[in-house]
Design a protein with these regions (language model features):
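Hinge/cleft segment of the Venus flytrap/periplasmic-binding protein
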Residues: 47, 51, 66, 70, ...
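Hydrophobic alpha-helical segments within soluble ligand-binding/sensing domains
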Residues: 18-44, 88-90, 114, 138-142, ...
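Flexible loop/hinge segments that line or gate small-molecule binding clefts
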Residues: 1-25, 36, 43, 139-147, ...
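Structural recognition of the beta-strand scaffold that forms the well-ordered cores
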Residues: 1-3, 18, 43-48, 78, ...
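Short, solvent-exposed amphipathic alpha-helices that sit
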Residues: 26-30, 54-74, 88-92, 116-120
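Hydrophobic alpha-helical
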Residues: 63, 77-144
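Short beta-strand elements in bilobed, periplasmic/extracellular small-molecule ligand-binding domains
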Residues: 43-46, 67-86, 185
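Loop/turn elements at helix/coil->beta-strand transitions in domains of secreted/extracellular proteins
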Residues: 13-15, 39-43, 70-76, 101-105, ...
Length: 200
């Protein structure tokens, strides 16, 4: 399978292995970026992906693991589902800022929700950089958001599964054996490399 694990206990005779990113590690790296960009202080809101999805659970678990272990003054004031959808990210962010205008950090489980958070920030008079947004995926829009100043960091979720998947199939058919799990590497986009990476 690619990008998603099998999620039930039913035996599958044709299952070979899995290729994808380590979603827990993505969350950990997002937390490290948040701590770095925030200076370890402030009010944080989390835009959660869809409930019951392993990516959502893993990205949140990794993030909270690092944040809770670190000696920071970052306060999580809200965790609300926005289902990986830009429009829901916008609606949820509007609600969160209405309830607490002092929110100055946002962790979004994906780029679409992060980009949806930008219009409400503008509507509340925020300037680029006033609210630190850390997100995961690595879409062009989010990397451009770093250049524009609205996004502080992006952890990539590498979409280039093809070569690894083909290597696994070739190994299977030649009898060389296939690993049960193949983790692909994910980049990190920051203010230091965003322009160069977007040009690639």
């Amino acid at each position: 399978t690619i990008d998603r694990f099998l999620t039930n206990d039913t035996h599958c005779d044709t299952y070979i292995g899995w290729v994808g990113s380590d979603f827990v590690e993505q969350g950990r790296r997002a937390a490290e970026a948040m701590i770095r960009e925030s200076g370890g202080e402030g009010k944080l809101a989390i835009l959660l992906g869809a409930a019951g999805v392993n990516v959502t659970d893993d990205r949140n678990a990794g993030f909270l693991e690092v944040l809770e272990a670190a000696d920071t003054n970052i306060e999580i004031v809200a965790q609300q589902t926005a289902n990986y959808i830009r429009e829901e990210g916008q609606t949820v962010t509007e609600q969160l800022l209405t309830n607490d205008p002092d929110i100055n950090h946002i962790y979004a489980h994906n780029d679409e929700m992060a980009l949806g958070a930008v219009p409400p920030l503008k509507g509340f008079g925020k300037q680029p950089g006033d609210v630190k947004i850390i997100t995961i995926d690595g879409t062009q829009g989010a990397v451009q958001g770093i250049i524009d100043g609205w996004v502080s960091g992006v952890i990539e979720s590498n979409p280039r599964f093809g070569p690894n998947a083909m290597d696994a199939l070739e190994a299977f058919y030649t009898g060389d054996g296939v690993p049960q799990v193949t983790i692909i590497s994910d980049k990190e986009y920051t203010t230091e490399n965003a322009e160069a990476e977007l040009a690639n």
